[in-house]
């Protein structure tokens, strides 16, 4: 009570490291596959658009800007319907995103992954 918590040190994720430590398609990481969502399905209406001006969507979070001033989160893929992912991809349900940074600096990806985990993704 009344004491301010010190922010914990962020440890970058290693290449191919998962949180939780299971692959994204497993039950423990993402739950059961519920089926592809198409524009004409009822579940499409449940998807929530994101209009955050701090995110650069490929079709051209503030935590990224705090970590690296002047750098923005760049989402390259979210909900998708084009069929180029594996059959039960979470992209078809709107439950997966592919992200990078606006400067496309791959050395930031481990910390970016950690930021995503810390923010509930």
Swiss-Prot record:
The name this protein goes by in its record: Sonic hedgehog protein
Cellular compartments per GO CC: extracellular space; plasma membrane
Stated role: Intercellular signal essential for a variety of patterning events during development. Signal produced by the notochord that induces somite patterning, dorso-ventral patterning of the brain and early patterning of the developing eyes. Displays floor plate-inducing activity. Binds to the patched (PTC) receptor, which functions in association with smoothened (SMO), to activate the transcription of target genes. In the absence of SHH, PTC represses the constitutive signaling activity of SMO.
One GO molecular-function entry: patched binding
Top-level taxon in the UniProt lineage: Eukaryota
Family according to the record: Belongs to the hedgehog family.
One Pfam assignment: HH_signal
Binding site for Ca(2+) 1: 60-61, 76-77
Subcellular location: Secreted; Cell membrane
GO BP, one annotated term: neuron differentiation
PANTHER family linked: HEDGEHOG, SONIC HEDGEHOG PROTEIN
Comment on protein domains: The sonic hedgehog protein N-product binds calcium and zinc ions; this stabilizes the protein fold and is essential for protein-protein interactions mediated by this domain.
Post-translational modification note: The C-terminal domain displays an autoproteolysis activity and a cholesterol transferase activity. Both activities result in the cleavage of the full-length protein and covalent attachment of a cholesterol moiety to the C-terminal of the newly generated N-terminal fragment (N-product). The N-product is the active species in both local and long-range signaling, whereas the C-product has no signaling activity. Cholesterylation is required for N-product targeting to lipid rafts and multimerization.
Alphabetical UniProt keywords: Autocatalytic cleavage, Calcium, Cell membrane, Developmental protein, Hydrolase, Lipoprotein, Membrane, Metal-binding, Palmitate, Protease, Secreted, Zinc
Subunit: N-product is active as a multimer.
Binding-site residues for Zn(2+), renumbered to this chain: 91, 98
Residues at which Ca(2+) 2 binds: 61, 77, 80, 82
InterPro entries: Hedgehog (IPR001657), Hedgehog_sig/DD-Pept_Zn-bd_sf (IPR009045), Hedgehog_Signaling (IPR050387), Hedgehog_signalling_dom (IPR000320)
């Amino acid at each position: 009570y009344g004491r301010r918590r010190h922010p914990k040190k962020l440890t970058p994720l290693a290449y191919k490291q998962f949180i939780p430590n299971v692959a994204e398609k497993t039950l423990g990481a993402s739950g059961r596959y519920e089926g592809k969502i198409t524009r004409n399905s009822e579940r499409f209406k449940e998807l929530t658009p994101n209009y955050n001006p701090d995110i650069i969507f490929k079709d051209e979070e503030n935590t990224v800007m705090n970590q690296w001033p002047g750098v923005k989160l760049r989402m390259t893929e979210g909900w998708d319907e084009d069929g180029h992912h594996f059959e039960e991809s979470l992209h078809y349900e709107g439950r997966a995103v592919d992200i990078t940074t606006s400067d496309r600096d791959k050395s930031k990806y481990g910390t970016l992954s950690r930021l995503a985990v810390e923010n509930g993704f």
